[in-house]
Amino acid sequence: MLCVEIFDEEHEKDLQVNINNFLSELNENDVIDIKYSINAFTSSSGEQIYCYSAMIIYRIYK
């Protein structure tokens, strides 16, 4: 069965830590793909906000 896990953080280091923690629980042969995205925008108060996201596609066996 294919599954996905989605991560979304404001800091890239937090994203890295969370992804590495998740991947440490998987067999590396079960990871199909990792999609990565960065978005930046300005809030109504003028603050620059970054969004670092990743989606891991992986296989589990039942």
Where are these regions (language model features)?
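Conserved short hydrophobic interaction patches
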Residues: F22-E25
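Short proline/glycine-enriched turn/loop segments at secondary-structure junctions
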Residues: T42-E47
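Short, mixed-charge low-complexity intrinsically disordered segments
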Residues: E28-Y36, A40
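Surface-exposed ligand/attachment interfaces on beta-rich extracellular proteins
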Residues: L15
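C-terminal edge-of-domain segments
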Residues: Q48-K62
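Short amphipathic
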Residues: M1-E10
